[in-house]
């Protein structure tokens, strides 16, 4: 009997140890103490757009900014004075529509805050370490095709709330005495280590508007690949000018078809009672009017579908097709894929030429979409809301999603600079423990204003 007891006790101890390792994430390389190795975080600067800022659920707010991937990297590396443009809750979004909050999962319903937060450390007498600006573009489109970038543009950033409807350039850069551009403010910090993730919006704006439809006109195109390559090379050169020994980690551009904004609404008509596709006389699911095989229907279609668009009159609709602006057809998808392929080739080339480390966000996001990720028993997928990785706007990660991103950066940093920086314990980051749970009652119910503001953030 004692032998049986000892066997059971040993088995329980082993099981406890296994579960402990699973729940804590991979903290350090086995047998090797935590170390920054040759990575020099003396002055750590993060450059990029909303993904760097920690933007999520259509707003920038402090309780999420503390989980931006640069802030998490800084914490894991022992950086004690990593400053960000923190905004009190409920935060600030685009327009009067602010942070999204989900009020029901079955059916999925959400609302938005109209209250606004305020910057909490606007008087910091130096530039912020996190210079990620939501809406930033590598190339600012202009008729003369001049190589102007949001990273180097020294025009009056204080005018951006009026000129572009974007308050974040003013919020992040604040004071021209600290530098008139992201580049100048970054240089003022004399960086030793930089993360650079830029270029997503150079193609995402085109995709999110169904192929460039803005105010009824098809006017937007992805940044030309040659322009992207040239400007990215100039950004790399500028970083080298700041510090010849600078250490840089760059990330490439994910496939837009991997994010819920383009994958949540199916191409076929759903029966609102069963949440299953309506089958036509040919025995196949009936597509929304205006949608063909292979097309991606964006979240912007939700309010139109609710009003009867895309639905034949016999099924209770208004018999009008979904407009092109809410559908990314197969030809437009080819344009997007071509741009992303060219951008990622340029990023890889510039990284190789300059000795920068590279995070392959493209492959990581496609893996998440195809197979998901199992972390401490929690399944993360690319599903809208319930997948756990994305926030309520369908474009940006959640806090736990950003923790996963931080760990992907840390993997590359550890390998490149012989470091052993502990990974972030993803499950210790706030998040809704939903796992993979499908919506049970039809399509999500999201106010049109919220989705429109998410798209506006991506436009020049």
Where are the language model's segments positioned?
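C-terminal motif of bacterial Sec signal peptides marking the signal peptidase cleavage site
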Residues: 19-23
